[in-house]
């Protein structure tokens, strides 16, 4: 028989740096889950990822206090900032431009994000990522 699901917890956790402090501790503690068990498992699974890269994680909590989790790809905004070596987006995105991104860079990001996007093909994924780039004040070339 399948376990009864009590809830889902969505967090963004830096790769390899999960620890019991907020936001992880309180979120898991409210559901009675073993915080250290999650931290050790998450850090072990994210060893191959660049340390500190924020990763969305969806934790499924069960009635017997056990859990499973799925690690998703880094947010598109983070990948865009990393690709063009940017600290933060523009405060006024449609007025002040903070950088440029090429089609090749967008395709690389889209390939990384493809499994988490609802896009039907690579071109649609590139357009989705380009929209995210525009909304943070980055000029998009070749799309």
Swiss-Prot record:
GO biological process: translation
Record bears the keyword rRNA-binding: yes
Pfam families found in the cross-reference section: Ribosomal_L11 (PF00298), Ribosomal_L11_N (PF03946)
Keyword rRNA-binding on entry: yes
Keyword annotations of the record: Methylation, Ribonucleoprotein, Ribosomal protein, RNA-binding, rRNA-binding
InterPro entries the record matches: Ribosomal_uL11, Ribosomal_uL11_bac-typ, Ribosomal_uL11_C, Ribosomal_uL11_C_sf, Ribosomal_uL11_CS, Ribosomal_uL11_N, Ribosomal_uL11_N_sf
Assigned GO CC terms: cytosolic large ribosomal subunit
Subunit structure: Part of the ribosomal stalk of the 50S ribosomal subunit. Interacts with L10 and the large rRNA to form the base of the stalk. L10 forms an elongated spine to which L12 dimers bind in a sequential fashion forming a multimeric L10(L12)X complex.
NCBIfam families the UniProt entry points to: L11_bact (TIGR01632)
PANTHER family: 60S RIBOSOMAL PROTEIN L12, LARGE RIBOSOMAL SUBUNIT PROTEIN UL11M
Protein's recorded name: Large ribosomal subunit protein uL11
């Amino acid at each position: 028989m399948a376990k009864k699901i009590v809830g889902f917890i969505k967090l963004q956790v830096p790769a390899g740096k999960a620890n019991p402090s907020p936001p992880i501790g309180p979120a898991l503690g409210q559901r009675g889950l073993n915080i250290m068990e999650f931290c050790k498992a998450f850090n072990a699974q994210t060893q191959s990822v660049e340390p500190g890269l924020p990763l969305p994680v969806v934790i499924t909590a069960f009635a017997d206090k056990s859990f499973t989790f799925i690690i998703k790809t880094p947010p598109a905004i983070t990948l865009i900032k990393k690709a063009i070596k940017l600290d933060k987006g523009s405060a006024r995105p449609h007025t002040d431009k903070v950088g440029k991104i090429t089609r090749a860079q967008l395709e690389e990001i889209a390939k990384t994000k493809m499994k988490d996007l609802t896009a039907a093909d690579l071109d649609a994924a590139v357009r989705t990522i380009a929209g995210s780039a525009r909304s943070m004040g980055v000029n998009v070339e070749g799309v």
